[in-house]
Amino acid sequence: MDNYEGSDPWNTSSNAWTKDDDHVVSTTNSEPSLNGISGEFNTLNFSTPLDTNEEDTGFLPTNDVLEESIWDDSRNPLGATGMSQTPNIAANETVIDKNDARDQNIEESEADLLDWTNNVRKTYRPLDADIIIIEEIPEREGLLFKHANYLVKHLIALPSTSPSEERTVVRRYSDFLWLREILLKRYPFRMIPELPPKRIGSQNADQLFLKKRRIGLSRFINLVMKHPKLSNDDLVLTFLTVRTDLTSWRKQATYDTSNEFADKKISQEFMKMWKKEFAEQWNQAASCIDTSMELWYRITLLLERHEKRIMQMVHERNFFETLVDNFSEVTPKLYPVQQNDTILDINNNLSIIKKHLETTSSICKQETEEISGTLSPKFKIFTDILLSLRSLFERYKIMAANNVVELQRHVELNKEKLESMKGKPDVSGAEYDRIKKIIQKDRRSIIEQSNRAWLIRQCILEEFTIFQETQFLITRAFQDWAKLNSNHAGLKLNEWEKLVTSIMDMPISRE
């Protein structure tokens, strides 16, 4: 994935503002994006009414503030407040007091950040057992195109729902598709899992494909239910609890699809905690997500190939067993018992070899079942999480743009017009009021878009923070991989040792 240099709002290199007397000029000619969000947004007053008629109170940062970008955190965001010099105090004492206050603010901010991070990470436990089971209903519906139905059962009581003995609903693939579309509308800056592909026609009757799709749907819904935000969504809970046909319910019900930022304001506490390093970490992750996915996909692919090789080994050993059995039937004809009584002992040992092949074949078959049933899903779930993170990167790049830079420039130009109109008797009062209303509208838009940009920043930081917990999925996957291989290698070794001991008395001479 390309880095976000130059087009990403986390980048600070292309968004600087410079002040020249009373004029503010942008130093970049880039297209409108979050790069242009101006000012130390901490100074914006969200409590100021948006319809005020005052020209310079509460709507915009001052020109001094506009020198910095919202994405440029090289200076203390609160450095402009609470730092005035106290009269009648020596200069060196003032510096000490200011430094002490700054150090105290930094320490408090660090402590708040640590608490915030720990609290966010505690809400996400990807290693927890799945709480949703999906089973395919054998009977297929549909006149022209047959479709599969799924029994979706939750094993525990769901949040914000009344206890019920009946925990099973019937859903179609299209219902899962609707749910994901709703989640994307409501939470565009969250890690929304992907769905397995849907195929039409004869492929829908392919049992292997249907099995993979069912497993993919199970991973999707369980990832949703492990997400601290998505799991409490009312439509997710509706999806899991409403027993009626969901298509009919959607036609009758009225539900809200507005995104989670509606009527929400950024907290001052979060703005105090913010650090530029978060943006750098985000961009580093974005730059390597494709490589990470490719490497992990290849690891998972090798695991699946290993499973197929073991299955091939099972088939070969079954064939080997049949051949040994058939061969033991013809040996008495090659070596008549009347001349070779040792052939009976050899045949008895061939029966032991046949039993060994049967046992080791059974062990290998059990190994493939454990790989496909328990081990492989642990690797694939991490693939799904990486894919959801990459999709978040892509949506962020597309949807996080705004035109704050242009609005600020527009406000400054209109303010200059108002200044030039003062004292001129030939100026229309209606024109003056019109420009004034435009300024107020632009200022309102700046505050709204800047607030949205900060909410996006907070949302994405939350997602990237809970994503850090998924590193332990790597640990669990390889631990289980090592245990599985060790256990089955031990079982196979034990069978081989038993075979060696058993056939050591096999005749090697007539004596």
UniProtKB/Swiss-Prot annotation:
Topology relative to the lipid bilayer, per the entry, is:
Peripheral membrane protein
The residues the entry assigns to the signal sequence are none
Null allele outcome, as annotated, is: Fails in retromer-mediated sorting of VPS10.
GO MF terms held by the record: identical protein binding; phosphatidylinositol-3-phosphate binding
Record-listed a 1,2-diacyl-sn-glycero-3-phospho-(1D-myo-inositol-3-phosphate) binding positions: R172, S174, K198, R213
Domain named PX: residues: 128-247
- Gene3D superfamilies in alphabetical order: Phox-like domain (3.30.1520.10)
Q: Where is this region: Disordered?
A: 1-36
Cellular component GO terms held in the UniProt record: cytoplasm; cytosol; endosome; endosome membrane; nucleus
Its localization reads: Cytoplasm; Endosome membrane
Per UniProt, the keywords (alphabetical) are: Cytoplasm, Endosome, Membrane, Protein transport, Transport
Q: Does the entry feature the keyword Cell cycle, yes or no?
A: no
Top-level taxonomic group? Eukaryota
PROSITE patterns named among the record's database cross-references: PX
Q: Which SMART domains match?
A: PX (SM00312)
Residue spans of biased composition, Polar residues class:
25-36
**What family is it from?**
Belongs to the sorting nexin family.
Q: What this chain does, per the record? A: Required for vacuolar protein sorting. Component of the retromer-mediated endosome-to-Golgi retrograde pathway. Required for efficient cargo export from the endosome, promoting VPS1-mediated fission of retromer-coated tubules that bud from the endosome.
Please provide the record's free-text comment about the domains of this protein: The PX domain binds phosphatidylinositol 3-phosphate, which is necessary for peripheral membrane localization.
Q: What else is known?
A: Present with 2210 molecules/cell in log phase SD medium.
Assembly and partners are described as: Homodimer. Forms an autoinhibited tetramer consisting of 2 homodimers that self-interact, wherein the membrane-interacting BAR surfaces are sequestered and the PX lipid-binding sites are occluded. Interacts with VPS1.
Q: Report the protein name in the record.
A: Sorting nexin MVP1
Taxonomic lineage of this organism? Eukaryota, Fungi, Dikarya, Ascomycota, Saccharomycotina
The protein's gene is named MVP1
